[in-house]
Design a protein with these regions (language model features):
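Conserved donor-nucleotide/metal-binding helix-loop-beta segment in metal-dependent transferases, i.e.
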Residues: 86-123
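Catalytic core and acceptor-binding pocket of nucleotide-sugar-dependent glycosyltransferases
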Residues: 129-222
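N-terminal anchoring/stem segment of glycosyltransferases
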Residues: 1-61, 70-73, 182-183, 195-197, ...
Length: 346
């Protein structure tokens, strides 16, 4: 396998840290950035300008999807999200898992879903996109008669034959859709490959945990100060109700107050990402049947927040117009906490 291979990423503004890598001879590692403060002895820096005034997020997506003239000297490009750490031999990975002799592009299968319509709902639940933008895009897909369960990619890693014309045509459509509709590239990728007919080799591995890539999480600049609240299971993007409520701080506790808009038996409260924090208590103002906290490592009386959004699941009988107050304590993970939790796990 003598193809010229590059691994590349893009960090705009100060959204991510540039991770160290396990370098492999014969592969070049490129970081495109508009931040001159970012330096690395592992990555070759390629400085870029925002000539189209896209803003940091779309500029990074542009490099991710459309690439850059610098990449045209390579046969194969491997895009890696700025939150991923490259840790394994990538020539072996390309040879064993990507099948580029038969396909011009390879992607990891989404680890949870296989359908754009389900992913659109998840984007609202996890506050990845505005509902109005999602609905506009879903209307477009329905007009195009785009099928359900067509497939869904984890777009954190993309392996492409860099100069393949069908790949370039598909990437152009992908970026156009991203700019026109919702700014979540996972939503517009399946339609793009369906529309152009680009054949993809699907990699059936967890992109976040495998011998070649490891998830390190994006930088969290500030704490989430609002909660997204759902009543019973959120299935219908068009009609089901949710609320966005503020998170207030009083007496070392976080407090969420809201009126329940309909009779229901379960309320889920998404309080956002709090990686490295611990929640030591959660209380509700009304009588309930059960309360669960997910995800995280549950070691009573601690719940350790991980990379995903923290969600409180509250079960009971709730009436329309009923006032509910949620109190919880959250703070930084200390060495004392680590020791106490370690003792409970032994």
């Amino acid at each position: 396998m003598n193809e010229r291979i590059c691994v590349y990423t893009c960090i705009t503004g100060d959204y991510d840290n540039l991770h160290e890598i396990v370098k492999e001879d014969g592969i070049e590692y490129l970081c495109f950035t508009n931040n001159p403060k970012i330096k690395s002895s592992y990555w070759k820096m390629v400085y870029i300008e925002d000539e189209d005034n896209l803003g940091n997020m779309l500029l990074s997506r542009k490099i991710k999807i459309l690439g850059h003239p610098y990449l045209e000297q390579y046969d194969i490009s491997i895009w890696v999200d700025g939150a991923l750490e490259v840790k394994g031999k990538l020539r072996q990975f390309v040879k064993e898992w990507c099948d580029l002799s038969r396909y011009p592009m390879a992607c990891f299968c989404h680890r949870l879903r296989n359908c754009v319509y389900d992913e659109a709902r998840a984007c609202i639940v996890h506050r990845k996109a505005d509902k109005e933008d999602v609905i506009k895009y879903l209307n477009f897909l329905e007009q195009e008669e785009f099928p359900k369960e067509y497939g869904l990619a984890e777009c954190t890693v993309l392996i492409r034959k860099e100069n393949d014309l069908e790949v370039k045509r598909t990437m152009k459509l992908w970026f156009e859709l991203l700019c026109k509709y919702v700014k979540r590239d996972q939503l517009s990728f399946p339609y793009s490959i369906w529309k152009t007919g680009l054949k993809i080799h699907w990699i059936n591995l967890n992109v976040f945990d495998n011998p070649w890539f490891f998830w390190k999480a994006h930088k969290q600049k500030e704490e989430t100060k609002s909660a997204r609240i759902f009543f019973d299971e959120y299935k219908d993007v068009y009609n089901d109700i949710y609320l966005d409520g503020s998170i207030e701080s009083e007496d070392n506790k976080e407090i969420i107050r809201f009126l329940i808009p309909k009779e229901c038996s379960e309320i889920s409260v998404n309080v956002g990402k709090h990686f490295g924090k611990i929640i030591t208590s959660v209380d509700v103002s009304s009588t309930i049947k059960a309360l669960d906290v997910f995800p995280g490592m549950d070691v009573p009386p601690y719940t350790v927040a991980d990379y995903d959004d923290m969600v409180f699941y509250i079960k009971g009988h709730f009436c329309e117009g009923q006032k509910l107050i949620i109190y919880y304590e959250i703070h930084d993970f200390s060495e004392v906490d680590m020791q106490e939790i370690g003792e409970k796990l032994v």
